[in-house]
């Protein structure tokens, strides 16, 4: 007999840096999950992914055990990294006026690579559609897509 699911918890955490402080502790604590076990498991699985933000969906069962699925990083995070917008000295989120002020550039080749990476979590199987979706996200952030 399968275990009974008591809840799902969705979080976005920096790779390799999960700790029991908020938001992880309170979110998992209210479901009775062993917080340190999750943090150790998540950190060991994501240690090689650098400073990317990793969305994770945690399934909590009635016996307080859990499993989790890691998704690909958000498109905006991947685009910022590709455009070179986020550095330690100058953290940036994009343009405040994306239709007037452009803050970076990505090439079609970079966009294609990002779309291929992101396709497993998107609702399309067509690479062109995924590229258009990524280009729209870039445009709304004030990032130019160049040939």
UniProtKB/Swiss-Prot annotation:
PTM details? One or more lysine residues are methylated.
Q: Where is the signal peptide?
A: none
Q: Which UniProt keywords apply?
A: Methylation, Ribonucleoprotein, Ribosomal protein, RNA-binding, rRNA-binding
SUPFAM superfamilies assigned = Ribosomal L11/L12e N-terminal domain (SSF54747), Ribosomal protein L11, C-terminal domain (SSF46906)
Looking at the UniProt record for this protein, which Gene Ontology cellular component terms does it annotate, in alphabetical order? Answer: cytosolic large ribosomal subunit
SMART domains, A to Z? RL11
| A GO MF label | structural constituent of ribosome
CDD domains recorded for this chain? Ribosomal_L11
Family annotation (PROSITE patterns): RIBOSOMAL_L11
Give GO terms for biological process: translation
What the record says about family reads:
Belongs to the universal ribosomal protein uL11 family.
Report the function annotation for this chain.
Forms part of the ribosomal stalk which helps the ribosome interact with GTP-bound translation factors.
The UniProt entry, under PANTHER family, shows: 60S RIBOSOMAL PROTEIN L12, LARGE RIBOSOMAL SUBUNIT PROTEIN UL11M
Database matches in NCBIfam families = L11_bact
Task: Describe its assembly.
Answer: Part of the ribosomal stalk of the 50S ribosomal subunit. Interacts with L10 and the large rRNA to form the base of the stalk. L10 forms an elongated spine to which L12 dimers bind in a sequential fashion forming a multimeric L10(L12)X complex.
**The protein, known as:** Large ribosomal subunit protein uL11
Native source organism of the sequence = Sorangium cellulosum (strain So ce56) (Polyangium cellulosum (strain So ce56))
């Amino acid at each position: 007999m399968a275990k009974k699911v008591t809840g799902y918890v969705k979080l976005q955490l920096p790779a390799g840096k999960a700790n029991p402080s908020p938001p992880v502790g309170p979110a998992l604590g209210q479901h009775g999950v062993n917080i340190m076990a999750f943090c150790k498991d998540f950190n060991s699985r994501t240690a090689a992914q650098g400073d990317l933000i990793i969305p994770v969906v945690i399934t909590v069962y009635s016996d307080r055990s859990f499993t989790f699925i890691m998704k690909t990083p958000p498109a905006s995070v991947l685009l910022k990294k590709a455009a070179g917008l986020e550095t330690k000295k100058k953290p940036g989120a994009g343009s405040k006026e994306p239709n007037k002020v452009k803050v970076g550039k990505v090439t079609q080749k970079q966009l294609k690579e990002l779309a291929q990476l992101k396709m497993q979590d998107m609702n399309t199987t067509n690479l062109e559609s995924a590229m258009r979706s990524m280009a729209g996200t870039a445009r709304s952030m004030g990032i130019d897509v160049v040939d």
